[in-house]
Amino acid sequence: MHLEITDLNRVFVGKRGSVVALKNINMHIETGEFVCAVGASGSGKSTLLRLIAGLDTPTSGTINVDGQRVTGPGADRGMVFQHYSLFPWMTVRQNVEFGLKLQGCSQKERFDTASYYLDVVGLINFSEAYPRELSGGMKQRVAIARSLACHPKVLLMDEPFGALDIQTKERMHEYLIDIWQRLQCSILMITHDVEEAVFLAQRVYVLSSRPGTIQRELTINLPGDEETPKNRTYKIKREPEFFKYSDEISSLLRGRETEETEAIAS
């Protein structure tokens, strides 16, 4: 899988004039990579993900998946949203099978595929439960299983853990690292949480705000990354390298905010 974003721009036109949400975005994601795009509010993170998902149309520029131009939603891109997007009247299994049913898969194929991915996310014993019976973290694991069940080439994640408490979020990070390494899937996740980006990603794109542009691209190399599988647990947050990357990204974001504040004041 190769995701290529070239000279991407998105301008919104309203009664009060034009707003440039994204300007000259160039990014790429290779097969099996975990990439994060981090930025503050107003950096166009969610707009970027919606464009890649085919839920919005760029003003100019191109998005290609394996050389095919994105012109709308497709099964080659899975999406996990920040807010729980499960159907409350369906069981966990039915939620995971939903996309497969739309694709015309047989009942046996739906059952087997859903069982596999529910096992991957550690929820096989909750197959017949309803979303109301699950915690927030469990709901997001179901959403991840549902997206993965359709075998997307890239999994798009829109701040999926933003509504979770810190302890649940940390557990979800380790679940996600394990899922990514077991399935060797490609993931693009957007977040405003700097430590989340450094902990999860192999590469991080730092976005500025108003308009959203790429300030910098960083390759993350933490102790244990040379191992197979990568040994990323929460002990890694004590390492000097983790602080270095987090501080560099935070400084970039703070620097941009300072420039904007000074511009408004003048």
Curated annotation (Swiss-Prot):
Cite the ABC transporter domain residue spans from the record.
3-234
Bilayer disposition of the protein: Peripheral membrane protein
One of this protein's GO BP terms?
Answer: nitrate assimilation
Q: Which Pfam families match?
A: ABC_tran
Matches recorded under PROSITE patterns: ABC_TRANSPORTER_1 (PS00211), ABC_TRANSPORTER_2 (PS50893)
Q: One GO molecular function term?
A: ATP hydrolysis activity
Q: Might you give the EC number(s) for this enzyme? A: 7.3.2.4
The protein's UniProt keywords, in alphabetical order, are: ATP-binding, Cell inner membrane, Cell membrane, Ion transport, Membrane, Nitrate assimilation, Nucleotide-binding, Translocase, Transport
Location comes to: Cell inner membrane
Task: Quote the catalytic activity from the record.
Answer: nitrate(out) + ATP + H2O = nitrate(in) + ADP + phosphate + H(+)
Write down the top EC class of this protein.
translocase
Residues where ATP binds: 39-46
Out of the domains of life, which is the source? Answer: Bacteria
Gene Ontology terms, cellular component aspect?
plasma membrane
Give the multimer and partner information.
The complex is composed of two ATP-binding proteins (NrtC and NrtD), two transmembrane proteins (NrtB) and a solute-binding protein (NrtA).
PANTHER family, alphabetized: ALIPHATIC SULFONATES IMPORT ATP-BINDING PROTEIN SSUB, TAURINE IMPORT ATP-BINDING PROTEIN-RELATED
The text of the family note is:
Belongs to the ABC transporter superfamily. Nitrate/nitrite/cyanate uptake transporter (NitT) (TC 3.A.1.16) family.
Q: Which purpose does this protein serve, as stated in its record?
A: Part of the ABC transporter complex NrtABCD involved in nitrate uptake. The complex is probably also involved in nitrite transport. Probably responsible for energy coupling to the transport system.
Q: What is this protein called?
A: Nitrate import ATP-binding protein NrtD
Query: What is the species of this protein?
Result: Synechocystis sp. (strain ATCC 27184 / PCC 6803 / Kazusa)
Q: Which gene encodes it?
A: nrtD
